[in-house]
Amino acid sequence: VQVQGEEVFVKPGEGLAEEIDSLWGLYRSLISNMVKGVFTQFEKVLTFQGVGFRAAGKGSDLELHLGFTNPVTVKGPVGISFKVEKNKITVSGIDKELVGQVAAEIRKQRKPEPYQGSGIKYEKEIIIRKAGKKAAAAAA
């Protein structure tokens, strides 16, 4: 990795092992994402659907009411911010990997189920719906 002026160059080393040489593209994309994240924050948008489901931001934490007896609190790591609007949760930050990890942890709290479609899903995620017992019995 070389920095010349305002440009960063990632060049494969001479005579290095093939395993190290194969990581060249990985390092290039990691550095590129770090630079891109500083200028434009990365964000993931999650939507939730279900009876009584709601979310609220409390400081740097996110409180989710997902039909359990107690609300679920997701701690926001340093550099991650939450924005809640109606049934949308926006996770944003400068670290692409951390934004994706936090969004996955939120989704894990109540994955979308295929019969009614209730749960937490990514905004553009398509949930394949299944026919229920009544629909399956009527078709038979």
Predicted regions and their residues:
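Ribosome-associated RNA-binding proteins
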Residues: V1-A140
